[in-house]
Amino acid sequence: SYLLKQVVNVDDIREILFNVSNKIILPSFGNLSNNQISYKNNKDIVTEIDIKVEKELYSHFSKLIKNSKFVGEETYSKDPSILNYYQSDNYCWTVDPIDGTSNFAKSKERFAVMVSLTKNKQIIQSFIYKPIGEEFMFADKTGTFFKNKKIELSVNTTIENSIGSISTKYWDGNKKEKLVAIKNNFKNINSYGSIGCEYFDIVLGIRNFALLSRLYPWDHIPGVFIVRQAGGHDCHFDKLEYKFYENSKNLVVSSSKNLSYEILNLIGE
């Protein structure tokens, strides 16, 4: 079945991301002028570079698989109906051209390019590329790989030893208070300002979890799959795995099922 093989060659993707990074992203890092930065929906910034990178990736990926669909963060801001592509049986690329745009614009190193390939509501392959350091992690049906090694998450962390993020921005009042109240139960709560870089570090055992509210697919499909295929765990509050193809909310992603359930328990879910 098509799920058992790599649909696209990892080296092709790595090369595309490396080239786009060296051609478009890195030359602008630390060199952005204010007129290259704008706001969408009053709070999220977008740079000319995000838009250029997305266009470039679209042109490459549409050639790799004929008739494939494309969901990009910047394309979505012009046409939200593209999320319907997940309901079709076409291959669909999901792209976050620069995850951590704010960091990128402030010359902070934590940002990533994230890509996923899905079909029939299944995630098939995912890729995260960090331009600073040229770090590349990917996952397919056989597992998660970094630096030519298969990564197996074996950390069995408890809440009091856990480091992670709790995004309180989009919860309603009641839940928000609860989330603020539980922060002290963990070893450390902080955010990178790039969820892609957080997922990367959950796989490497540097972090342990992320508790999320608003779920845009380009922010989460790549990283959730990479964590899942490394032996980590993801679930909505109903304990079912992430449904990227629905307008779902509230997700916990962690290094183990036990930790996810402990966190859900703590917030009373």
Give the label of every model feature segment.
Residues 51, 74, 97-100, 131, ...:
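Generic detector of well-ordered alpha-helical packing
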Residues 118-122, 132, 141-144, 149, ...:
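Short loop segments at secondary-structure junctions
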